[in-house]
Amino acid sequence: MIFQLPFNTPSKKNSRVTDRRTGRSFPSDDYRKWHKAAVAWLKTHYKIEKIEGQVEIWLTFVHKDKRRKDSDNGTSSIFDLLVDVGILPDDCWTVITDHHVSNRYEKGVSCCTVEIEKADSGGPR
């Protein structure tokens, strides 16, 4: 399964907002807007199929500027999205047995290409 999300992928864990009354933290508005748009994009443009068993994932992030970003933050956001949309049952290590992340810069372009293969299929690479 291969698909592309034409959005900048925000960090879920570094952009949290804390309720001062309760002390609970929540994902930021930017993250929630991205998540809602990404779910809608996937459901509109791709046939969502649940993948059972172990998988390997390749992520390619294209960044619109050269600002510093940690790759693992975007990775976590994408993994959570895959679970929330129903492609994966969980994002734990027993499901995602291996993942590969690459990053590149293209002025003014933000997107993430996601490739998912069953771990026992030999993968696309």
Features from the language model and the residues they span:
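Catalytic phosphate/metal-binding cores of nucleic-acid and nucleotide-processing enzymes, i.e., regions
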Residues: 1-125
